[in-house]
Amino acid sequence: MAFGAGGGGGRRPFFRRRKTCPFSGPNAPKIDYKDVKLLSRYVSERGKIVPSRITAVSAKKQRELAQAIKRARFLGFLPYVIR
């Protein structure tokens, strides 16, 4: 008997499930420039804003998040650069 001859024991292809936006939904947190703990989760260890393809934030919420991070930096709640 030949291997792989339609025996039904083949592997299924791997599909990565699309992550949902953490800011959409009924009990999702509100993006606020004063919430430093929330904003710091979306800033890298070097101080850069993490892209939405990594954090799975929707495009609209990513724009709001970026604006809140920039506002928090301007007011001194978040640093511009982390050394």
UniProtKB/Swiss-Prot annotation:
**One GO MF term, please?**
small ribosomal subunit rRNA binding
Q: Does the keyword Lipid metabolism apply?
A: no
| Statement: the UniProt record of this protein carries the keyword Ribosomal protein | yes
Which GO cellular component does the record give, naming just one?
cytosolic small ribosomal subunit
UniProt KW keywords:
Ribonucleoprotein, Ribosomal protein, RNA-binding, rRNA-binding
Gene Ontology annotations of biological process type: translation
Q: Which family does it belong to?
A: Belongs to the bacterial ribosomal protein bS18 family.
Mind telling me which NCBIfam families this protein's record contains?
S18 (TIGR00165)
Query: What do we know about how this protein assembles, alone or with others?
Result: Part of the 30S ribosomal subunit. Forms a tight heterodimer with protein bS6.
User: What does it do?
Assistant: Binds as a heterodimer with protein bS6 to the central domain of the 16S rRNA, where it helps stabilize the platform of the 30S subunit.
Instruction: Tell me the protein's name.
Output: Small ribosomal subunit protein bS18
Q: Which organism is it from?
A: Methylobacterium sp. (strain 4-46)
Question: Which gene is this protein's source?
Answer: rpsR
